[in-house]
Amino acid sequence: MTAPAFTAKAFAAFAPFTLLGAVTILVMLLIAVRRDHRLVALSTIAGLLLCCIALPLAAPASPVAVTKLFVIDGAALFYAGLVLVSALVVAALSWVYLDRVGEGPREEYYLLLLTATLGAAILPASVHFASFFLGIETLGISLLGLIAYAGPRGSAAEAGTKYLILSGAASAFLLFGMALIYAAFGSMSFARIGALAHQAGPADLYRLAGIALILSGVAFKLSLVPFHMWTPDVYEGAPAPVTAFIAVVSKIAVFAVILRFFALAGAHADASLRAGIAAVAILSMLAGNLLALLQTNVKRLLAYSSIAHLGYLLVAFLAAPALGVDAAAYYLAAYAVTSLGAFGIVALLSAPGAGRDADRIEDYRGLFRTRPFLAASLALMLLSLAGMPPTMGFIAKFYLVVAGVGTALFWPVAALLLGSVIGLYYYLRILVAMALPAPGDEEARHPNAVPPLGNAVIGALLVLLVVLGAYPAPALALIRMTIGHG
């Protein structure tokens, strides 16, 4: 790896992130010059597409340190790619969703989406507390605006307020944890902290306390028990495309940076931390699935489901770095495809001016008759979330179980298997509702015509879900090529 200076090689490796910043500035200028929803939406989608194309072009220049704050390597590019592709899908769904609003201020939404994506994209490359906190706060503050961005809907403003208060508390935990570690070692570099981690005495106590506080702040961002209370309310109140962004993009970014922090800081060796994380994983799996059983609101149900899925992901986190890195990467990819598809279908069936999204289970009655393609797609997405073959979700859970058993994580693996059985029941509730006849006029229950762009996005996600579920070798080869040798 080259020295931490901004050389030509570093500039080439950092180009996708620089391009994303330039696209953000361009969209801001477009909004200032001319308010045109179509133009701003197209510019956002085109800009994100260019950033996705730039990622493989930046790969030959990696691994390289970009100042002391970032390292662009295979892992950073892989997770940034997941973030950018997911943001591209959300931008396309947002165009369809906001196009139904009619007149009104819609353009700033895309600016917030881009700044949130920029914060999320730099997190996987962060190797310093300064870049870690900068990325997570850029993401969090932008999300605050996106959550409350719903015109006259009071539920969105309420969700935004809850997120503001609790996110501020989580940021305080993060900062205090970073301060304790800096007090112990006099450095904010992940690698430097790891090099000094063998020290015993007061410094080690500060380090453990600091890591525990950082994990508490991260647990809020990942919706892990007991820091999950905000999740169902925010998921329900936010516009459906924003819910998809929170469920996927923010989770990928935060999980990637904490995985890097633990690897470089040598925290995987601490038995007390591992025991605490295992307990959080088991509680998240069981609480998320059991609470989802009680829900009649689809977005709240998927919110509790996401809590359980992040608990599953902690099995790979605990198995890292021995077996869990590849399993975590594939699981995040599978989770991104399925969650984007599920929330995307909710967005396509929703009318923003109706006061709420199509988020009640009863709203989906008769969907197989009125919207057969969307109903079949949602059925496969839900089966993937349940871990059923031949979807990506099955392969992802299989690798989690293999990684967990291979590192003797028997209790978390048992909770994973039990949670998957419970989850199958509440996913089937939605499937049964879609197959039942709707009372009254079926067509009146799903009046929104789905534009070609919406069908194309869901179709692309569906192809990935089935093809990479039946034949996961290309995805696994990409993961091993980037993360395994990054």
Swiss-Prot record:
The keyword Aminoacyl-tRNA synthetase does not apply. Keywords: Cell inner membrane, Cell membrane, Membrane, NAD, Quinone, Translocase, Transmembrane, Transmembrane helix, Transport, Ubiquinone. It catalyses: a quinone + NADH + 5 H(+)(in) = a quinol + NAD(+) + 4 H(+)(out). InterPro entries: NADH-Q_OxRdtase_suN/2, ND/Mrp_TM. It is a multi-pass membrane protein. The chain crosses the membrane at residues 11-31, 39-59, 76-96, 108-128, 129-149, 165-185, 208-228, 239-259, 275-295, 307-327, 329-349, 375-395, 398-418, 419-439, 456-476. Its EC number is 7.1.1.-. It comes from the Bacteria. Belongs to the complex I subunit 2 family. NDH-1 shuttles electrons from NADH, via FMN and iron-sulfur (Fe-S) centers, to quinones in the respiratory chain. The immediate electron acceptor for the enzyme in this species is believed to be ubiquinone. Couples the redox reaction to proton translocation (for every two electrons transferred, four hydrogen ions are translocated across the cytoplasmic membrane), and thus conserves the redox energy in a proton gradient. This is NADH-quinone oxidoreductase subunit N 2. It comes from Acidiphilium cryptum (strain JF-5).
